[in-house]
Curated annotation (Swiss-Prot):
E.C. numbers: 7.6.2.14
Lineage of the organism: Bacteria, Pseudomonadati, Pseudomonadota, Gammaproteobacteria, Pseudomonadales
Protein name in the entry: Aliphatic sulfonates import ATP-binding protein SsuB 2
Gene3D superfamilies listed in its UniProt record: P-loop containing nucleotide triphosphate hydrolases (3.40.50.300)
Membrane topology (UniProt): Peripheral membrane protein
Organism of this sequence: Pseudomonas syringae pv. syringae (strain B728a)
Binding site for ATP: 53-60
């Protein structure tokens, strides 16, 4: 069988045994500006990867490329056919009910049953017929997540999906994402500006700078995670350094969490207890 042309569009799903995401010397430019500059990346089956970087570093362009919403100018890119993306804005059709938004674009006979199952997984079985205008921000984002899950993706792309949510809702969404990831085992790429969020959720954190991977750190911390864990502050300190943030104080191997972290840890315990 002929080798597919990989220069401008993602190829079909890789063969068994290969990483579901493979990028080799990928370039994407707008005019003379290279937003992605010779990028190489593998994401293993079922791996949860977080992507950090300053604004303009190429994070969203990379995610859009993996989602099939943008092309590459050169290089090779392989992604699964079964993939889904969730963005910061839920992007729900306001004239369609929750369940119809979940199966939007799918041609299946048991659409409502599939939508109901997906909404049940995200805790919204009771909002099956609700319209987007009646949903809270967290509920709307869960509908968007259900829309991704109903497609049974091998790759789930998350572009800052929690950025507009309040602190407690974000924590609950973090736990929901982890629970669903464990159940469905897709590879996940999360784009975020939040260093703590990246450490809390990911197996591996990658820092993007000027369209290239500056470094990657494996997060070898047990779950459930919070910022008070031994080792959390060490990983945070290193990531902040890679992002160009000066860390003034030396970080001890078992640091005392600052006041904000204590508050967030308490919120996580409260959210997990409910």
């Amino acid at each position: 069988m002929a080798t597919p042309d990989l220069r401008n569009t993602p190829s079909v799903s890789p063969e068994a045994g290969q990483a579901p995401v493979q990028l080799r010397n990928v370039v994407r430019q707008f005019g003379r500006q290279r937003v992605i500059d010779g990028l190489n990346l593998d994401i293993a089956p079922g791996e949860f990867v977080a992507l950090l970087g300053a604004s303009g570093s190429g994070k969203t362009t990379l995610l859009r490329t993996l989602a099939g919403l943008d092309e590459i100018d050169s290089g090779e890119l392989r992604v699964p056919v079964a993939r889904a993306a969730v963005f910061q804005e839920p992007r729900l059709m306001p004239w369609k009910s929750a369940w119809k938004n979940v199966v939007l674009g799918l041609r299946i006979n048991d659409a409502k049953a599939r939508a109901e199952a997906a909404l049940t997984e995200v805790g919204l079985a009771h909002r099956l017929n609700a319209f987007p205008a009646t949903l809270s921000g967290g509920e709307a984002q869960r509908v968007a997540l259900a829309r991704g899950l109903v497609r049974e993706p091998k790759l789930l792309l998350l572009d800052e999906p929690f950025a507009a949510l309040d602190a407690l809702t974000r924590i609950r969404m973090h736990q929901l994402i982890i629970d669903l990831w464990r159940k469905h085992t897709p590879a996940v790429l999360l784009v975020t500006h939040d260093v703590d969020e990246a450490i809390l959720l990911a197996d591996r954190v990658i820092v993007l700078a000027d369209g290239r991977i500056a470094d990657g750190i494996r997060v070898d911390l047990p779950r459930q995670r919070d910022s008070g864990q031994a080792g959390f502050q060490l990983i945070r300190s290193r990531l902040l350094g890679l992002l160009g943030v000066k860390v003034h104080a030396a970080v001890d191997s078992a640091p005392q969490a600052p006041e904000q972290d204590v508050t967030l840890s308490a919120l996580r315990r409260f959210a997990n207890a409910r």
